[in-house]
Structures are given as C-alpha cells and as structure tokens.
C-alpha cells in the first residue's frame, strides 16, 4: 500500500485491512509518528485471533479468516483470489446459538468467484456442511467438494495437499479449526 509516495508492506491481506491500515496511519501521523516508525509497526503486526492469521511449515502454508456474514465471506474469498498458485479450501458453517440458527446468508455470499481460482479441492465441514456443499454446487464451482462434518478432521485433511490452505470458519467453528491448524503447523505460525 502506498500513501504519500511511501510504500508500506503489511503481513495481512484484504481490502478491508488496507482500510484499517489507512485509518491507523492517519491517527499515528496525527500523533506525530513518522512513516518509518509506522512501517515498522505494519511489518511486524501479526494476528493470532483467526483473523487473517498465517501459518507456514516447510513448503506448506495456510491462512485462516473468520467469516460470520456475506461481507466477511466475500472478503475471505477475495483473499483467495489474490493468492497465486493452487489452493485447497476448508470452509466451516455451524448453526449453533452463538452463530445464529439462520445460515441463509451463505446464499448472499459470492461463492461464484471460486470458479476463477486454481483450486484442488474444497472441504466443507461443520453442522451445516451439506448446506455449504449445496451452495457451492449452485455456484457451479467445478472442483472436488469433500464433506467432513468433523471440523478437526476436515482441517487436518488440508495437510494432505501441498497447495496453500485457505481456512474459513464461522464463529463457533473458529476455535476447533484454529486449534487444528496450530497442531498441524506446530511452531509455524507467522
């Protein structure tokens, strides 16, 4: 991202994070920090809460980003669009009380954009895995779609692929998906 002819490098992707960074930049400049100091902060910031959190171990890489609504899902799918090379997705949808019982919002998300990506497989999981599978079929996503209701097992299956893993949980599936990624990438969180 370039602001006033100064290029800032960030470890987190996504248009929404660029807007957050721009807001942070504005406040930090107002407080008197210079561009070099702000750059150090941007370069060293990492997330550990399942929001644009990256993992790497050997040649395997992954990213997890929470999606609780169409806007969050679209943002996560857009990050996948920006990644070069093959990808494997693991997408989880639960309908527990904390998630909200109504999962019809997935029909407002733009899953059709997956058709333009180089995807080896999509693993769907959670209490509404079959609903995700149907949504992907309606979006005419022509890649293998694997249903694994157990979130831990579904997330672990992504390690069978050498391609980049894009993990997208909703609220109550975040903890088990993040726990499994931490196990799989032991010592490889970035």
Report each predicted region and the residues it spans.
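Active-site beta-alpha connecting loops in nucleotide-dependent enzymes
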Residues: 66-147, 188
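Generic beta-sheet signal
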Residues: 61-62, 87-91, 163-169
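Generic C-terminus detector
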Residues: 130-138, 143-190
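Short, surface-exposed connector motifs at secondary-structure boundaries
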Residues: 6, 58-60, 113-119, 140-141, ...
């Amino acid at each position: 991202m370039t602001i006033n002819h100064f290029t800032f490098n960030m470890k987190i992707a996504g248009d929404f994070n660029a807007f957050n960074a721009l807001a942070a930049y504005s406040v930090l400049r107002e407080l008197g920090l210079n561009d070099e100091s702000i750059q150090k902060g941007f370069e060293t910031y990492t997330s550990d809460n399942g929001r644009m959190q990256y993992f790497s171990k050997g040649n395997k890489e992954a990213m997890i980003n929470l999606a609780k609504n169409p806007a969050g899902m679209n943002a996560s799918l857009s990050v996948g669009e920006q990644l070069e090379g093959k990808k494997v997705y693991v997408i989880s949808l639960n309908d527990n009380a904390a998630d909200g019982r109504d999962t019809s919002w997935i029909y407002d998300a733009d899953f059709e954009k997956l058709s333009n990506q180089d995807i080896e497989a999509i693993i769907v999981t959670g209490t509404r895995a079959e609903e995700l599978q149907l949504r992907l079929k309606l979006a005419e996503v022509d890649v293998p779609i694997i249903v694994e209701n157990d979130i831990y097992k579904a997330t672990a299956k992504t390690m069978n692929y050498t391609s980049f893993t894009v993990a997208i949980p909703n609220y109550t599936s975040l903890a088990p998906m993040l726990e499994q990624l931490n196990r799989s990438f032991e010592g490889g969180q970035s």
